[in-house]
Amino acid sequence: MKKIVVLGCGLVGRVIAEDLSQTYTVTSVDISQKNLDNLKSESISKICKDVSDSAVLNEIIKDCDLVVGALPGFMGYETMKRVIMAKKNIVDISFYPEDPFGLDKLAKDNNVIAVMDCGVAPGMGNIIFAHHDKMMKISDYECLVGGLPKKREWPFEYQAVFSPIDVIEEYIRPARYVQNKSLIIKEALSDTELVEFDEIGTLESWNSDGLRTLIQ
């Protein structure tokens, strides 16, 4: 059975590990024992270590077939780089600020498959766009994405659905998008507008830096 190491056992990493454990041999790694204790699947091996230490990381991933990165954004890029240098394939969901294409040559030189930005958006939004781009001619693309709690409570009616530090980062990092073939950079939370959704009601949207690789 394939061996997968999931780095990070937070809100998202925990779910990834539990889903994968139904089919694969999974090891979950986190610096917090409390996070690891929240895992429901007894088949998941747990390692409480700090993977910012290269020696620790290399020892943990040396026998695995695939690494899944689910660490906070500030750790994502460097961790992905070190996994590639260890010649391990990696799928990553971290919301880091660095340009992921900076790792392209390194991945090719090490014969590694490295897939970045595999969340909802960026991630699923990119895949949906690519699918429709094959099916029809697209001249404009706008992606609206959000995480909403089942129970909406004032004043924000919002809930952090991934690493809180990255939620904050999403709302302060400059937002980039392409208009008339030119790269436009605006402040996060700019150009607010109200959007209506059936059975949900009125929501507010604004610019955030979520297109990522689509900008290329």
What feature does the model see in each segment?
Residues L7, M136-Q216:
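Active-site-lining helix/loop region of Rossmann-like oxidoreductase modules
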Residues V12:
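Hydrophobic/small residue at the entry helix of a nucleotide-binding pocket
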Residues S28-I31:
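Conserved acidic E/D residue at the C-terminus of a beta-strand in Rossmann-like folds
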Residues Q33-N35, P97:
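Helix N-cap at the beta1-alpha1 junction of Rossmann-like dinucleotide-binding domains, i.e.
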Residues E42-D53:
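Rossmann-fold cofactor-recognition segment
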Residues V51-D63:
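Conserved Rossmann-fold cofactor-binding substructure of NAD(P)-dependent oxidoreductases
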Residues L66-R82, Y96-P100:
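Beta-loop-alpha module in the N-terminal Rossmann-like domain of NAD(P)-dependent dehydrogenases
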Residues I93-M116:
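Rossmann-fold NAD(P)-binding glycine/threonine-rich loop
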